[in-house]
Amino acid sequence: MKKFLLFVLFLCPIVSMAQEQTKIDSTMIVRISEIEVYPEYLKEYLEFAHNVGATSVKEEPGVICIYPMQQLRNDCQIRILEIYASLEAYQHHIKTEHFQTYKQGTFHIVKSLDLVDMRQMAPECLPLIFNYCCPLKV
């Protein structure tokens, strides 16, 4: 029982810090785009996805991450992890020339699209993940 109480007391500051970090990051938009592309346009789509992701992160301060990925079991299944500093950053992003080029250029390529908004479960880990390779832009 004594060990359990010590464990609970140890966790209290960690939970408190996590709750405080959640308040800070509550304005962030985190989304996974689930995309299926037509096989005959796969190569073309991959170029569009790479370009819009790289340009967005490089040129838009409110874009924290646009990370396109392909399923190993089905090349035509694409997932894009999108993280924006705020709703305003997302709204700015979708109005940019590079996003509009992507959207218009892939209209005939995308078979299905589902934008899945996500809730962060460990927002305090986000800086650690992104600082592993590069500083977090918020």
Which ranges hold each PLM region?
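Bacterial Sec-dependent N-terminal signal peptides
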Residues: 1-22
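Hydrophobic alpha-helical segments, especially transmembrane helices
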Residues: 3-4, 32, 94, 104
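Glycine-rich beta-strand-turn "strand-cap" elements at beta-sheet edges
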Residues: 19-30, 67-74, 103-138
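Short, glycine- and small/hydrophobic-rich beta-strand elements in well-ordered beta-sheets
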Residues: 20, 54-79
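An amphipathic, aromatic/His-enriched active-site/gating alpha helix that lines ligand/cofactor pockets
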Residues: 24, 55-65, 83-118
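N-terminal targeting signals for Sec/Tat export/insertion, comprising classic cleavable signal peptides
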Residues: 27-58
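Short hydrophobic/aromatic beta-strand micro-patches
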Residues: 36, 81-83
